[in-house]
């Protein structure tokens, strides 16, 4: 397959995504097919975002690593020493993707490391490995193109996470600001009693202890539930089951107490 045809195959994957998140597993499969190598897309912390195997490596440690989708921490950290594409590293290299305990089996193993960079920061690493055949310029062009695409996708996901985080925080702040002084006091006592993200409590006991009416507690819970911050369910005589749905809620509540 010529370089242009291989590039078009990668482009076809991106075009089929059409604004949707690119699946790192599919991306790895396509890279594996066009570059004809084992492909590992590794995050900054060593998480395997995607991988595809062209040549099976019979090694228990490697199999466990793939099952756990996690590269060893020491190896992941060492990858940050590589700041530009390093190709055709042999099995004696500290960066080899082949199991060092089986060097005699993988003497022909070659590894190529491609940093994934986006927005001026290191986002991860693309690791390619194959037996025998060297990585040529065409392979490296495809690898660097792929790493750019992966970098853009990681940046997009990070931007979405930040946006979602801000949205969750805003929802919590609005829900808390909708509470009256007595309702806020009730909520503080409820989650002090709950001491976690979910549990069972008896509203009337809290009302008696704090010196507020049960209706204040009911109204406060209803406001938080309608905002999607918590879920509550009456279990009759047993009390009310409460579960926090928005992970920003308890942090914001704690911050209010310290102010």
From Swiss-Prot:
Residue intervals annotated as DNA-binding region are 203-222
- Give the Gene Ontology MF terms in alphabetical order: DNA binding; DNA-binding transcription factor activity; GTP binding
Compartments reported by the entry: Cytoplasm
Q: Which UniProt keywords apply?
A: Cytoplasm, DNA-binding, Phosphoprotein, Repressor, Transcription, Transcription regulation
Q: Give a GO biological-process term.
A: negative regulation of DNA-templated transcription
Q: Which InterPro entries match?
A: CodY, GAF-like_dom_sf, GTP_trans_reg_CodY_C, Transc_reg_CodY_N, WH-like_DNA-bd_sf, WH_DNA-bd_sf
A GO CC term attached to the entry: cytoplasm
Please give the residue ranges the record annotates as the region GAF domain. 1-155
- Residue spans making up a coiled coil are none
Q: Which residues carry this modification: Phosphoserine?
A: 215
Major localization listed first in the record, in broad terms: cytoplasm
| NCBIfam families according to UniProt | codY_Gpos (TIGR02787), PRK04158.1 (NF003170)
* Family recorded in the similarity comment: Belongs to the CodY family.
Protein function: DNA-binding global transcriptional regulator which is involved in the adaptive response to starvation and acts by directly or indirectly controlling the expression of numerous genes in response to nutrient availability. During rapid exponential growth, CodY is highly active and represses genes whose products allow adaptation to nutrient depletion.
Instruction: Return the PANTHER family for the record.
Output: GLOBAL TRANSCRIPTIONAL REGULATOR CODY (PTHR40062:SF1), GTP-SENSING TRANSCRIPTIONAL PLEIOTROPIC REPRESSOR CODY (PTHR40062)
Q: What is this protein called?
A: Global transcriptional regulator CodY
Organism this protein belongs to: Bacillus cereus (strain ATCC 10987 / NRS 248)
Gene (UniProt): codY
